[in-house]
Amino acid sequence: MQTKSLKLSSILFLLLFIPINYLFGQSELPKSKHYNLEKLADGVYAAIHNDDGGFAICNGGIVNLGDRTVIIDPFISPTAARDLKKHAEILTGRPVSLVINTHCHDDHTRGNQVFDPDANIIGTPDARRSIERDFYKAVESEKESSPKELLNFQKWMEQATDEEEKKELKMWCGYHQAKIESFPELKMTPPNITITDTMTIWGTKREIVLIPTGIGHTTEDLIAYLPADSIIFMGDLLFVERHPFMGGGDPASWKKTLQKIALLKPKIAVPGHGPVGDTNSIHVLIKYIDTLTEMVNEEIKKGTNKDKISELPVPEEYKNWWFSGFYKWNTLNFLYNIATAKANKD
């Protein structure tokens, strides 16, 4: 009996030092109510936002370089980021030492604070400047607006009759709930390392290539490329089955950036929002930018006024995409304004 007890104790002791994915197989990944982990390659995981009320909002990533652990875009909520940190440590067997911000937007960066000061945070100079300039101002504004917005979305969700619409509205409820829940603990945590040129971080298992892409979705974006795995984490340069948010970048430059990234022919392209995509997903977004740009320009040539352009129906191929509220913003407040400003300049 004593021998059996010693054997059992030895087994339990050894299990403490084996990462959970080796115990249960790669299909048994850690769970979070805020996101769903998807294994993309050995040691590479996408953390895809859970639309059913999760607090992640954007998609993130975990990359095991072999001798260090990297997190990409640690969400809008410190609560969701804590799950990501815990799961990264479980899956790789070590603490997180690097965090990558693909751009400045709060849904990709407010989780930074969970990893500070133990991990270095890498982003572009503009990401750092934007966070330093806007963080506290945005938080103070949202303390007033988010509770009202949450009530509005809850009301619209109750009134909705279409199931897909209800699902999307529930996602937006989660967005505002995540903000409200995080207000008491938020602290500004911008990147402490900024890069303006390609940076390769070499690990014992794989390298990760960080590529600043200039103006696109924002005034400075970057992608995280794993050449050995043919995987790219694209941040909000890529939306899949979602209307992209256009509001701080430039559609022509965005399109050129996507065309360059498509030349890499990634087998897997992780978007900032939506399900995991591939090279074809990049081409779909290029076509979206072209379609909306041409549509708005054609209406301007006809003399259609701004209000009428904002009422243009969503093209058939994009009718089932989520983030439908961005469509009106994209056509009216972004593409229209850019086109008319260019015409006036010419």
Predicted regions: what they are:
Residues 1-12:
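Bacterial N-terminal signal peptides that target proteins for export
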Residues 32-34, 39, 68-70, 76-78, 137-287:
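Metallo-beta-lactamase
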Residues 10-22:
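Bacterial N-terminal signal peptides
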